[in-house]
Design a protein with these regions (language model features):
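Conserved anion/nucleotide-ligand pocket segment
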Residues: 206-209
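Phosphate/pyrophosphate-binding betaalpha-module
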Residues: 136, 140-203
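Metallocofactor- and cofactor-centric catalytic cores in central/energy metabolism, strongly enriched
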Residues: 1-130, 144, 148, 152, ...
Length: 209
């Protein structure tokens, strides 16, 4: 039996849902931060198991969604510089900036390439030593270490044609900004566990405090 099988047992799920309904005596609003949580909650039909008093809200956990139009405009401008190769994740290609998108810039002649990791971008730099290669880095704390590793590798290999345009965001300030705005009254936050394994739980201690 796989460890995850116990979490997908129908009887266990029904028992947990019944316990939640029994304890739910007032309206509660919960926000999940991570886009992976949003996907899993919808995929497994969690909202249908919860009482109407429990309202699940999706937070800013999508790297694409939190990348500003201004940052995209700058990335597009870099890609349009002669000889520059811009590399990034496929999710970013069709995201609009203020005037155009990376896909449209690519169609217009810019050398924009989809990679699956910053290490792939490093390989592009190795293969094109006479051209500047820029990696558009997006995401939160979980994607930053791999980008940092690529930078250290480039330094060790003296790849002076490799640079990173980092648009990484920190998850605790993003959550704090939502709470401070006062527009959404939250009773709890389902925090991003994978982020906490990188930065530690102390960064999120402001929530219970």
């Amino acid at each position: 039996m796989r460890l995850t099988d116990r979490f997908r047992d129908p009887e266990t799920a029904r028992a947990v849902a019944a316990a939640i309904r029994a304890k739910s005596t007032r309206p509660v609003q919960l926000m999940e931060f991570c886009g992976g949580h949003t996907h899993a909650i919808l995929r497994f039909g969690i909202p249908t198991l919860l009482p109407a008093s429990v309202d699940l809200r999706s937070g800013p956990g999508c790297p694409v969604c939190v990348t500003s139009a201004g940052d995209l405009d700058r990335a597009i401008a870099m890609a349009q510089v002669p000889k520059v190769i811009l590399t990034t994740f496929g999710d970013m290609i069709r995201v609009p900036g203020s005037r155009t998108s990376l896909a449209q810039a690519k169609a217009g002649g810019a050398d924009i390439r989809v990679v699956y990791s910053p290490l792939d971008a490093l390989q592009v730099a190795r293969q094109n030593p006479d051209r500047p290669v820029v990696f558009l880095g997006v995401g939160f704390e979980t994607t930053a270490p791999m980008v940092a590793s690529a930078v250290l590798t480039a330094e060790a290999e003296n790849l002076d044609n490799f640079t990173v345009f980092s648009t990484h965001k920190l998850t605790p300030p993003a959550t704090l900004a939502i709470l401070d705005a006062g527009e959404v009254a939250l009773d709890g936050v389902i925090g991003p566990g994978h982020v906490i394994t990188v930065i530690g739980a102390d960064a999120w201690r402001f929530l219970p405090e």
